[in-house]
């Protein structure tokens, strides 16, 4: 799924609220997620990010590869999925070389890196939530995530939180 | 009241807005943020979004080349 497939799921009633479902754990899509989130928060939007499935990798405390999770299969998945620093790009990943090249280019061209965007999201108090169902499958606990993750939610609560604003699926 | 300077002329979206917002959040009411920025998106939107968030834009002036100065009061 490419960035061109970002879907606007709802028409806004309150233009000052942006909610993002962060499904992909891909480097480039996480850059898109956190660029939108921090930009919107900086110009006064309430911003909510609901991390689910591969997206949960972005908010793990351990940013590299580690056996996070309960049970042998979740631990194995946790290792191969890794955290923020292990995120692959969605195209031309070249066995993990491309994210390193992107990070180099971003620093060289003075564009915020993914890690800087995440730090900015924390500073701007972007509301980050984790998906209860995906956590259950992957054997993850709230304590496996960064402290800024406010809560563990299901679909109904996310719909309540996002109601009235724009919602994106990335 | 104090004046704090912020140079975002070398920054790109979204950090132009992010750094302005974070700098403003650290100020006391009545303090002034002096922002140096370039034409295009930063010049169009930093003053606009600051006004929309309730800050007072005191001045927008040309410095040199593409660089402009914006004074924002918290």
Explain the meaning of each model-derived region.
Chain A
Residues 31-44, 49:
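Histidine-anchored nucleotide/phosphate-binding helix
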Residues 47-53, 129-131:
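Short internal beta-strands
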Residues 56-68:
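N-terminal beta-loop-helix "entrance" segment that forms/cooperates
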Residues 94-156, 160:
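A charged, amphipathic interaction segment
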Residues 160-170:
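Gly/Ser-rich helix-loop-strand patches that form or flank binding pockets
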């Amino acid at each position: 799924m490419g960035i061109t497939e970002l879907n606007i799921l709802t028409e806004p009633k309150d233009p000052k609220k942006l909610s993002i479902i962060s499904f992909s754990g891909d480097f480039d899509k996480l850059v898109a997620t956190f660029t939108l989130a921090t930009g919107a928060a900086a110009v006064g939007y309430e911003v909510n990010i609901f991390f689910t499935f591969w997206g949960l990798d972005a908010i793990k405390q351990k940013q590299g590869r580690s056996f996070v999770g309960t049970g042998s299969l979740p631990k194995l998945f946790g290792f191969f999925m890794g955290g923020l620093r292990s995120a692959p790009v969605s195209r031309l990943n070249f066995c993990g070389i491309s994210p390193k090249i992107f990070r180099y280019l971003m620093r060289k061209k003075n564009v915020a890196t993914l890690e800087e965007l995440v730090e900015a999201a924390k500073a701007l108090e972007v509301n980050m939530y984790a998906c209860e169902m995906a956590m259950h499958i992957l054997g993850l606990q709230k304590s496996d995530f960064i402290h800024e993750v406010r809560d563990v939610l299901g679909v109904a609560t996310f719909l309540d939180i996002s109601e009235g604003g724009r919602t994106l699926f990335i | 009241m104090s004046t704090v300077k912020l140079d975002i002329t070398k920054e790109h979206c979204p950090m132009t807005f992010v750094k302005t917002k974070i700098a403003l959040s650290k100020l006391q009411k009545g303090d002034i943020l002096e922002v140096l920025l370039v034409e295009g998106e930063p010049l169009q939107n930093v003053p606009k979004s600051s006004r929309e968030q309730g800050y007072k834009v005191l001045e927008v002036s040309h410095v040199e080349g593409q660089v402009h100065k914006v004074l924002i009061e918290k």
